Each structure stands twice: as structure tokens, then as C-alpha cells.
Amino acid sequence: MIYMNDLKLPWNAQFDAPDKYGLAPGKTFNFKLGTSDNHTLGAWFILSDAIYHTIPFPPSPSAAEQTLSEALTSHPTIIFFHGNAATRALPVRIQQYSAFTSKLCANVLAIDYRGFADSQGSPSEDGLSTDARAAWDWLISNGAKPDDILIMGHSLGTAVASALAVTLSQEAVRFKGLVLMSPFSSMYTLVDTYSVFGLFPVMLPLTMVPHAADLYKSFLQHKFDTLSVITKVKVPVLIVHAENDWDISHTHSDAIFDALLEPYLPSVDALPNEPLSRTKEQWSTYQTQVAKKREVRESLLSRTYMPNFGVMVKFVASGETIVLLKTLTGSHNEVGTLEGTQEVIRNVFSFA
């Protein structure tokens, strides 16, 4: 249920023929990416339109590979970590690559994790983190500058992207930023709220048996706990979620945004667990602290309402910009295809 990597849509894809799936002829370099634990991953490097348009048309099939170095040194690159199921050739993912290469004038590196598509191995939380680092290292080894690389994840890919962003931040590597589209705060929370097609809560049958849900979660091997590590990321962060996402509730994005904001808010002393043991003074102090925290929170936040599109909430702290974009439409899979989302990405991360 977590990975669904056997659902290799589109079926029998020809990854060495990316133009068959809507990308322009000669714009994409299909290659194999090696990992530190000796797995081989399928990957596409897609040229920025700004570079692609300098190549005489029609380009040779190897045009993207031949132009790789120039593309990486002259234009920013987005590493795109997709969600569960399917492959890098899924139409909705192709739409996003095309938009990013045109609207943002960015190159795109899209990989398939181990066990997905034409990649070797079986997926695991540690394995996907290793795959993400391999993608980063490949870009750097081919001439990309860290501050030209935007790390982006969708759904499951947000946990992968966050883990890479945390690792790089701990290594004091300064990169362009982090985008989380339709994220979940942790796998523990997701299993409580996830609904298939927005209609069938996966945990509903277990809630009918006392403690069954807690027992099930205790056996989760893949935690993907973005919420517990996101504050370690030291670059600008954009969180994007559609209010009509019926797969993963937009409350997950609220939780991640609140976690990033929390260190800049005054603390509130906890009240005694037993209501009868609370003194009048404790309750008064608690109310005062809560009011102060709310006041400081509102002073830090700015809101921009965009009619018929959504709302953008932003704060700047420690020199970093943190943005939460809530769109009215886009559902779970298509929020990244919205032109409004792409414009927000362009503005937050100063794409040309």
C-alpha cells in the first residue's frame, strides 16, 4: 500500500523513447543512475526550454546528453521525486516536467526509485533516501551548483525530498530550496487519515476492534516521519496542498507548516493533567501565554488571497522564507500542473 511499485503505469513503457510520452524530440536524456549500494535506477534528464531552443531542430536523439554540461551550468535544475505507484512516464508527471522546463526555464531530473519502473531492487525507506542522494550526487558530479538545485517531491516523494534536504542541511550544503506538494506529516498519521479515492478510510475496519489500529501502526517499518525532521531544513520551503485533495488531507500540510513556525513562537506552560489540580493562577497564566503566542503568530504571518485559486501564507525567520500554498482545486495528483502553483514556485525561488 505504501509503494505500489508493481503498478508500473504506463504499462510496458519504453523509457528510452521519452518523446513517445509527450516530451519534445531530443529534449530528454534517458540513462541509468548508480547508487552507493550498487543498485541501478532509471532516470530522465530533461533540458530547460531555454537550452533546448538553442539546438537546431529537429535535434539528434543524443542532443540532451551532448548539451548536459551546458544545461547544468547555465540553468537551475529541479530534482523531482514522484509519489507512489506508476513511473516517471505517467502523463500527469510529464505535464509537470514540461511546465517546469518552460515556465521556470529549469532542467528536470526525474528518477524512478528502486523497484519502480526500470530500476533495480526493492523499495524501502532507507533505500529511497539512498536513491535521492544518488540523484543529487549525479547532478553535482556533472557540474551543477548546489544553489541552482531545487528539491521537489510529490506525495510519497515529499518524504524522500525532505530526508535529502535534511541531510544536505546537516552537511551545511546550501541549495535553492525545497518544495513539498501534497505531503503527509508521517506514515503514522497518514494511516489514520488516508482514504482510497477519498471515499474509503483504510483504517476504518480496524477501528472496530479495540487497540487494533495502534497495534497495526506499531508494526510499521517505514515511518517517513517528515514532521519530526523538517525543522532541520535550512533553506526556503514551499508547501503546496489542494483543499480538494481526497487522498491526503491538507491538514498534513498545516502540521508541517506549524512545525516550521513553532520555534519562533513563545512557549506555553503545560497545565497539570488533572483538571481539579489546576490552580486559578495556573489557568490565568496559561490563558495569557496562549493569547501571546497567538498574537506573535499573527504578527509573523502574511496572507495573500488569490480569488478562485487559493491562499498563500508566508513567514520569514532566520533569513529563510517559508510558504504554505492552499489551492482550491488540483486534487491530489494535479496540484503541480496548475499554472498558479507554477507561478508561486517561480516567485518564491526567484526563477527567471
Predicted regions and their residues:
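C-terminal catalytic histidine-bearing segment of alpha/beta-hydrolase fold enzymes
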Residues: D247-H250, D254, Y264-A352
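Membrane-embedded segments
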Residues: G34-W136
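Short beta-strand/loop motif that positions the catalytic acidic residue
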Residues: K232-V233, I239-H241, D245
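Hydrolase active-site cap/lid region
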Residues: A163-V229, W246
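N-terminal membrane-anchoring alpha-helices
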Residues: M1-L23, V268, P272, S284
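Glycine-rich nucleophile elbow surrounding the catalytic serine of serine-hydrolase chemistry
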Residues: G153-A163
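Short beta-strand immediately N-terminal to the catalytic nucleophile in serine-hydrolase-like folds
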Residues: I151-G153, V179-M181, V240
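Alpha/beta-hydrolase fold nucleophile elbow
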Residues: G143-S155
